[in-house]
Curated annotation (Swiss-Prot):
<dbReference type="GO" id="GO:0004064">
    <property type="term" value="F:arylesterase activity"/>
</dbReference>
<feature type="active site" description="Proton acceptor">
    <location>
        <position position="114"/>
    </location>
</feature>
<feature type="binding site">
    <location>
        <position position="116"/>
    </location>
    <ligand>
        <name>Ca(2+) 2</name>
    </ligand>
</feature>
<dbReference type="GO" id="GO:0016020">
    <property type="term" value="C:membrane"/>
</dbReference>
<feature type="glycosylation site" description="N-linked (GlcNAc...) asparagine">
    <location>
        <position position="254"/>
    </location>
</feature>
<feature type="binding site">
    <location>
        <position position="223"/>
    </location>
    <ligand>
        <name>Ca(2+) 1</name>
    </ligand>
</feature>
<protein>
    <recommendedName>
        <fullName>Serum paraoxonase/arylesterase 2</fullName>
        <ecNumber>3.1.1.2</ecNumber>
        <ecNumber>3.1.8.1</ecNumber>
    </recommendedName>
</protein>
<dbReference type="GO" id="GO:0004063">
    <property type="term" value="F:aryldialkylphosphatase activity"/>
</dbReference>
<dbReference type="GO" id="GO:0005576">
    <property type="term" value="C:extracellular region"/>
</dbReference>
<dbReference type="GO" id="GO:0046872">
    <property type="term" value="F:metal ion binding"/>
</dbReference>
<dbReference type="InterPro" id="IPR002640">
    <property type="entry name" value="Arylesterase"/>
</dbReference>
<keyword id="KW-0106">Calcium</keyword>
<keyword id="KW-0472">Membrane</keyword>
<feature type="disulfide bond">
    <location>
        <begin position="42"/>
        <end position="352"/>
    </location>
</feature>
<dbReference type="InterPro" id="IPR051288">
    <property type="entry name" value="Serum_paraoxonase/arylesterase"/>
</dbReference>
<comment type="similarity">
    <text>Belongs to the paraoxonase family.</text>
</comment>
<dbReference type="InterPro" id="IPR008364">
    <property type="entry name" value="Paraoxonase2"/>
</dbReference>
């Protein structure tokens, strides 16, 4: 009897493990291959060799680019080099990327930048919020952009018990923001188990010096986050659920769910065109390839443009896609004056004229 029971339990465990593996592969789009969509006027951005995970463009055409992310389980092309923030002026005829100098006193050696967001105050001061992972922790670094000498003045480091595994932020004030925690755990083994078991423990947190609180939960992996031009809605990409959530923002900073747009790809960071309200997102057609790191079968790239997301039937257009021969692991796409920047988790960056 005992042997029969043991065999039954082993069989049940094996069946559950197989079901979880299948679900995990589906969340990663493990069998998808991308059909190419080419853009004619593109070039790789010189100087960006180790990632361009997130990009934020000011209304005047200055683009901030985070580079050098080291993320658990993912490849890094410069594992021993600190992260950097680059600047590009998209008004120039041939824009170039230049590294921004960061003020003394900031720990550059452990700088590991992830998502970024800018905020322009009433006096035109530009603040740059940078998700940082020093020593496998999560902080948000607040900088002031010093345009006269193209540098960043570090103002403060933000830590909080609710900011556990921060992926991205969207600034809503000079010292306040919404942040996505892409996992409950940050340790890679526990993070993998969380993904494998399909736990929906990821969330969104609102932070200000006076109040910190969870404002949305129940995501497989809340990733990119941004805000509508009218500041009424917050957009959240759940990368492993293949969708974008629209949340209404209230006066008390709480969020309520409005709708979910389902996609057939893994949407990473979200950028919003301030003129049209269109959402642009860098996507991973097949997330499994990000983790396998096979040089003969690299992760592909994909860029989507989402128009009229509040409509009953939003328009989703594949603007760019390729098999990884040019760009590997696209994480962001953003536009300014018919110029498109496409960034990656750990690879190069692309500049295109539309």
């Amino acid at each position: 009897m005992g042997k029969v029971l043991a065999a039954a339990l082993i069989g049940i465990a094996a069946a559950l493990a197989a079901e979880r593996l299948l679900a995990f592969r589906n969340r990663l789009n493990a069998t998808r291959e991308v059909d190419p969509v080419a853009l004619p006027n593109c070039r790789l951005i010189k100087g960006i060799e180790a990632g361009s995970e997130d990009i934020d463009i000011l209304p005047n055409g200055l683009a901030f680019i985070s580079s050098g992310l080291k993320y658990p389980g993912l490849k890094s092309l410069a594992p021993d080099k600190p992260g950097e923030i680059f600047l590009m002026d998209l008004n120039e005829k041939k824009p170039k990327a230049s590294e921004l100098r960061i003020s003394r006193g900031f720990d550059l050696g452990s700088f590991n930048p992830h998502g970024i967001s800018t905020y322009i105050d009433k006096d035109d001061t530009v603040y740059l919020f940078v998700v940082n992972h020093p020593h496998q922790k999560s902080t948000v670094e607040l900088f002031k952009f010093m345009e006269e000498d193209n540098s960043l003045l570090h103002l403060k480091t933000i830590r909080h018990d609710l900011l556990t595994s921060v992926n991205d932020v969207v600034a809503v004030g000079p010292d306040s923001f919404y942040a996505t925690n892409d996992h409950y755990f940050y340790d890679f083994i526990l993070m993998f188990l969380e993904m494998y078991l399909g736990l929906t423990w990821s969330n969104v947190v609102y932070y200000s010096p006076k109040e910190v609180k969870e404002v949305a939960a129940g995501f497989y992996s809340a990733n990119g986050i941004n805000i509508s031009p009218d500041k009424k809605y917050i957009y959240i990409a759940d990368i492993f659920d293949h969708n974008v959530h629209v949340m209404e923002k209230h006066a008390d900073w709480n969020l309520t769910h409005v709708k979910t747009l389902q996609l057939d790809t893994l949407a990473d960071n979200l950028s919003v065109d301030p003129d049209t309200g269109d959402i642009w997102t860098g996507c991973h057609p097949n997330g499994m390839k990000l983790f396998y790191n096979d040089p003969d079968n690299p992760p592909a790239s994909e860029v989507l443009r989402i128009q009229n997301i509040l409509a009953e039937q939003p328009t989703v257009t594949r603007v760019y896609a390729e098999n990884g021969s040019v760009l590997q692991g696209t994480s962001v796409a953003t536009v300014y004056n018919r110029k498109l920047l496409i960034g990656t988790v750990y690879h190069r960056a692309l500049y295109c004229e539309l």
